[in-house]
From Swiss-Prot:
It holds the Pfam family UAA. The chain crosses the membrane at residues 45-65, 71-91, 110-126, 134-150, 160-181, 200-220, 235-255, 274-294, 303-323, 327-347. SUPFAM superfamilies: Multidrug resistance efflux transporter EmrE (SSF103481). Residues 366-381 have a biased composition (Polar residues). This is GDP-mannose transporter. It comes from Aspergillus niger (strain ATCC MYA-4892 / CBS 513.88 / FGSC A1513). Coiled coil: none annotated. Belongs to the TPT transporter family. SLC35D subfamily. The keyword Transmembrane helix applies. Keywords: Cytoplasmic vesicle, Endoplasmic reticulum, Golgi apparatus, Membrane, Sugar transport, Transmembrane, Transmembrane helix, Transport. Residues 66-70, 127-133, 182-199, 256-273, 324-326 are lumenal. The lineage of its organism: Eukaryota, Fungi, Dikarya, Ascomycota, Pezizomycotina.
Length: 381
């Protein structure tokens, strides 16, 4: 589309050539179109705030549902979220707000392995978030970036710059500090320290598996998307549509649907609020995709990268505000180091994009669609 625009701008109109002088003046270079000054939709502050708010909303709503007493219907939660997402984007398509291709059995067959990786990723992510606090979960999610980067090196011939490597070191350091702060607080706090440490260890194991699943999903999607040529909402449509039947089967056969367990997961006093949070968490994934595309359109991809890095801080702080996450010097230090690592990584990506494209990580080179990038950011958040 951009190439077509360039061609139109520099096309020579033969009837405008001065036949007497046998010469002509080249048309002036195209001027950037400034958005209408009075339009709220073109105010760069609004999409940035909307994107950050959507990311926080999704994480907080998921944590609220998963932090219930002995919640164990994770597959059902993910199924509801996928169903809500399909209804939402289909409604938006009917209203002309977004567009994506119609369902094709052949495309579904090609994409189904990616959907299975997605299910593994979101399930292990929900289990990790269930056992860990939001700040620790957010910090450890940064480790996925390292796995993806070196996966690109192994399978796509990429390379890692020195600044990127430095950001990786900060990510690992922040994760070590966060784990140490969590275990230290569990040992020193009142109650059964052994049980608390055991819960944290389970969370760390789920987090490790989630990082592996997430990197496999992102790398697999990068390779598979060449076969389907999916755009932003095509990916969202097929991911959620294909995951629904799988999640229904997994929930029906692997989860306890006895009346006792259902009442434990959905206490009568909190049932409506839990269901509302489940629906809202499903809508938030659509909000993230839409607001990230809005953010890139109104600002720039560079600004969007920095917003994604800065967004880690409010997400981590939301865990301190809305939930009983320990506020100690080590835990705050881990958040700060993780925040700085995100900024350094974003700066490294920006510098890579500014350099010639030889010898640079493929993840930084191709122009990534806004909602595809936002999907990666939401998985890290």
């Amino acid at each position: 589309m951009a190439e077509g625009k360039k061609t139109d701008d520099y096309t020579i109109q033969m009837d405008s050539i001065d036949q007497g002088n046998k010469s002509f003046e080249a048309p002036p270079p195209p001027q950037p179109r400034s958005p209408p000054s009075g339009s709220l939709s073109n105010n760069p502050i609004l999409p940035v705030l909307a994107y950050c708010g959507s990311s926080i909303l999704m994480t907080v709503m998921n944590k609220y549902v998963l932090s219930g007493t002995d919640f164990n219907l994770n597959f059902f939660l993910l199924c509801i979220q996928s169903l809500v997402c399909i209804i939402a984007i289909q409604t938006c398509k009917s209203c002309g707000l977004i567009t994506y291709r119609d369902f094709s059995a052949d495309e579904a067959r090609k994409w189904f392995p990616i959907t299975l990786l997605l299910i593994g990723m979101i399930y292990t992510g929900s289990k990790a978030l269930q056992f860990l606090s939001i700040p620790v979960y957010t910090i450890f999610k940064n480790l996925t970036i390292i796995l993806i980067a070196y996966g690109e090196v192994l399978w796509f011939g990429g390379s890692v710059t020195g600044l990127t490597l430095f950001s990786f070191g900060l990510m690992v350091l922040s994760s070590i500090i966060a784990a140490w702060a969590d275990i230290k607080h569990a040992v020193e706090s009142n109650g059964d320290a052994t049980a608390k440490v055991s819960t944290l260890n389970a969370g760390y194991i789920w987090m490790l598996v989630n990082c592996l699943c997430t990197s496999s999903y992102v790398l697999g999607m990068r390779k598979r998307i060449k076969l389907t040529n999916f755009k932003d909402f095509d990916t969202m449509f097929y991911n959620n549509l294909l995951s629904i039947p799988v999640l229904i089967v997994l929930s029906a056969f692997l989860e306890d649907w006895s009346s006792t367990n259902v009442n434990r997961n959905f206490p009568p006093m909190d049932r409506n609020s839990i269901v509302f949070a489940m629906i809202l968490s499903g809508l938030s994934s659509v909000f993230i995709s839409y607001t990230s595309a809005w953010c890139v359109r109104v600002t720039s991809s560079t600004t969007y990268s920095m917003v994604g890095a800065l967004n880690k801080l409010p997400i981590a702080i939301s865990g301190l505000i809305f939930f009983d996450a320990p506020v100690t010097f080590p835990s705050v230090s881990a958040i700060v180091v993780g925040f700085v690592s995100g900024i350094v990584y974003a700066v490294a990506k920006i510098k890579q994009n500014a350099k010639p494209r030889t010898g640079v990580l493929p993840t930084a080179n191709p122009p990534v669609s806004a909602s595809s990038q936002s999907m990666r950011d939401s998985l890290r958040s």
